[in-house]
Amino acid sequence: MQETTVKRDGASPSDAGTPATTAQGLGKLYIRTFGCQMNEYDSDKMADVLRADQGLELTDNPEDADVILFNTCSVREKAQEKVFSDLGRVQHLKKQNPNLVIGVGGCVASQEGEAIVKRAPYVDVVFGPQTLHRLPDLIKRRRAQGVSQVDISFPEIEKFDALPPPRVDGATAFVSIMEGCSKYCSFCVVPYTRGEEVSRPFDDVLLEIADLADQGVKEVTLLGQNVNAYRGAMGDSGEIADFAMLLEYVHEIPGIERIRYTTSHPKEMTQRMVDAYARLPKLVSFLHLPVQAGSDRVLAAMKRGYTALEFKSVVRRLRAARPSLTLSSDFIVGFPGETEEDFQKTMKLIEDVGFDTSFSFVYSRRPGTPAADLHDDTPQDVKLRRLQQLQALINQQAAAIAQGMIGTRQRVLVEGPSRRDPNELMGRTENNRIVNFPGVPRLIGHMVDVVVTHAHTNSLRGRVAGIERDTSGAE
C-alpha cells in the first residue's frame, strides 16, 4: 500500500497551473490518495471533473483547500484506519472555513458507506470508485441541503462517458480500460468495493489513447484490477475484443512508443498474450504478475485458480517469447493455516522464478471476505519473520538484476528533473528501473539511450550514450 497527494505525471500538485476564473469563482482542491495505480488514476479524474465544473485547482496544502478529498484503499486494515486518523486531523479546518467540503471516496467509502458519516459526522460527501463523476452534483447538494451526501452505487461504466477529456502533463499517462473484479479471491475485498468486471468499449479506449498521443504522450499504462481479463465491445457489431487484440491496436497508434499494463492475473495470460511479447516491441519488458503464494494448498484456500507449477509454466512461456522480461509480483505471508512447509514452497518459487521487485505483506483480515472466517493460529512474530525472509530474498534478486545492468545501454523515457538533484534528469528503463543522469531540460519527454554506470538500492545512475563517462556514483 502506498499513499500520495494526487499529482500529474512529472508534476507536483503545486505545479497544476494558475487557477481559472469560472462562474463559481476560484477554489482549491486537496486530494490524498491511498493505494494502487487505479486510485491514482481515479484521483486524477476527480481533479479533472472538479476543475471542469467548479474551477477548482490542486493544492498540496489542505489548509488552503475549499474541498478536501480522501481517495481510500481497503485492501489492508491499517490503510482503512489511517483514513479515519487523517480525517480527524483536518476536522479543525471546518472551523476556519465553514464552507469547506470534506469527502471520502475509493474502496473504503464503497465498503463503509453511511457508516463513515456516523463515525465522522463532519464528512460531507461519500462516494465510490464508480460514482466519482457525480462529485460536482454531490458537493452542490451538500451545500444546498446541508445534509451529507452518500452515493456508492455501481452504475456500470457510466463514469467514463461523464468525465472531461484527459489533461496531459508529461510524456506518460494512465488509461483505465476496465473496472472491477470477478475472481473473488477469498482474501480480497475488491469485488465488493469496485464491483464485477466491466470493460470499456474498444473504440473508446483507442480514441482516448490516440488523443493522448496527439498531446505528446509517448507511454501509456493500461489499468484494470484484472487488466488482461479485458473484453471490450467493438462498436455495434456484437464482437468482443480481448486484451491481446487491444494491445495489438494500441501498438499501431502513431506516437505511442511504450505500452505498460497492470494488474494482470495468471489465469488470464492466454497464449495470444504470451505471443504479444514476441510480436509487439512497444510492449515493455516488464510485467507485474501477482502469484500471492507458492504452496498449492494455500493457493487453493485463496481461490486463486492455478497451481505453483501452472504459474511457473506461464512465466516460462513468457520468457521464451521475451528473454529480457523482468517480473514483479504480490505475496501474502501468513495466510490463515500457512505452515512453515507452505512458506518454504513460496521461497522455492521465488528462487525458481526470480523477481525484480514485489509488493509483499502479512495477511490482513478483511471483514466480509471468505478468508475472514478461516482459523488463524500462526503467531504474529512468525509471520513477520517470514515476511522479512521473503523480502530479503527478492531484494537480493533485484540487486543482482541491477548489477547486471551496469555497462548496458538502456532506452530511457525522460520524465523530468531528478528528485535527488534538480539539475539532473530522471527517466525509466523498459524494465521499470529509475535512472538518474546528467542532461539538459530539452530531453524531458523524449527517449534517450543511457549507459548504466552505477546501481543503487532503488535506482540506477548513468550517462547519455556518447557523452563522457560519469564516474561520480552519486545517487
UniProtKB/Swiss-Prot annotation:
[4Fe-4S] cluster 2 binds at C181, C185, C188. It catalyses: N(6)-dimethylallyladenosine(37) in tRNA + (sulfur carrier)-SH + AH2 + 2 S-adenosyl-L-methionine = 2-methylsulfanyl-N(6)-dimethylallyladenosine(37) in tRNA + (sulfur carrier)-H + 5'-deoxyadenosine + L-methionine + A + S-adenosyl-L-homocysteine + 2 H(+). [4Fe-4S] cluster 1 binds at C36, C73, C107. Residues 167-400 form the Radical SAM core domain. The keyword Cytoplasm applies. SUPFAM superfamilies: Radical SAM enzymes. GO terms for molecular function: 4 iron, 4 sulfur cluster binding; metal ion binding; N6-isopentenyladenosine methylthiotransferase activity. Catalyzes the methylthiolation of N6-(dimethylallyl)adenosine (i(6)A), leading to the formation of 2-methylthio-N6-(dimethylallyl)adenosine (ms(2)i(6)A) at position 37 in tRNAs that read codons beginning with uridine. It is found in: Cytoplasm. Keywords: 4Fe-4S, Cytoplasm, Iron, Iron-sulfur, Metal-binding, S-adenosyl-L-methionine, Transferase, tRNA processing. Residues 27-144 form the MTTase N-terminal domain. It comes from Bordetella parapertussis (strain 12822 / ATCC BAA-587 / NCTC 13253). Monomer. One of its GO terms (cellular component) is cytosol. It comes from the Bacteria. InterPro entries: Elp3/MiaA/NifB-like_rSAM, Methylthiotransferase, Methylthiotransferase_CS, Methylthiotransferase_N, Methylthiotransferase_N_sf, MiaB_methiolase, rSAM, rSAM_horseshoe. The lineage of its organism: Bacteria, Pseudomonadati, Pseudomonadota, Betaproteobacteria, Burkholderiales. Residues 1-22 are annotated as: Disordered. Belongs to the methylthiotransferase family. MiaB subfamily. Its main location: cytoplasm. Its cofactor is [4Fe-4S] cluster. Its EC number is 2.8.4.3. The gene is miaB. This is tRNA-2-methylthio-N(6)-dimethylallyladenosine synthase. Residues 403-466 form the TRAM domain. Binds 2 [4Fe-4S] clusters. One cluster is coordinated with 3 cysteines and an exchangeable S-adenosyl-L-methionine. Residues 1-10 have a biased composition (Basic and acidic residues).
